[in-house]
Amino acid sequence: YRSCTSWGRISPPNAAPLTMAAPHDLVGELDNSQCWALNTATEHPLANCIAMDKRTGAGVCQSDCDEELLITLTFLQKVRLSGLSIKAPKEGGPSSVKLYANRADAADFDSTKALPVTQELTLSPANTLSAAVVPLLTAKFPSVYKLTILIEANHDDAEETVIEQLAVHGAVNEIVGKRNDNAPKWSEDSGVEKFEKARG
């Protein structure tokens, strides 16, 4: 093997290849116990727009003191994101949306606004009325376990922002094929990658 330490990782032999399933609504991949929002009205919590059993239009998520909302979605496993959709009424639907990938330090409005934005979206009333899936730059969201969503403005400058349904679209990395159990195993020792024989 090459002895220099600047070269990238080489895939081990007989490794199971990774494949990507077709993009879909990732509501089933959310860890609802770790999803939360700031500045939501008590009677209109985040669960109304993300929980699978509450996506019936009976309830909404609504901001409280002003138009801003800070939403954190945590996934059960790492996902590759490809789109975002928000369903909302014409008045009060989100218009300015900033996304932050894998930021554990996005704890409140001030700290989040100080962070670099992963992608910024401007939603039209047509986008939110129809819950259109707005494409994301997948190269910026290849392996996401936490997504922070900052909503700074809404349509018609309404006092509160209203969301009827929030969905992120993408897929989970899936391993297909099976590794040969008798093949040499891949390990690391002091930063130098090497093979070691599989045990009997």
What are these regions (language model features)?
Residues 10, 14-74, 187-200:
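Disordered, acidic Ser/Thr/Pro-rich linker "stalks" and the adjacent N-terminal cap
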Residues 14, 32, 39, 48, ...:
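Detector for Asparagine
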Residues 58-111, 138-200:
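Aromatic, loop-rich ligand-recognition surfaces of beta-strand-rich domains
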Residues 111-139:
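Extended, solvent-exposed segments with strong compositional bias
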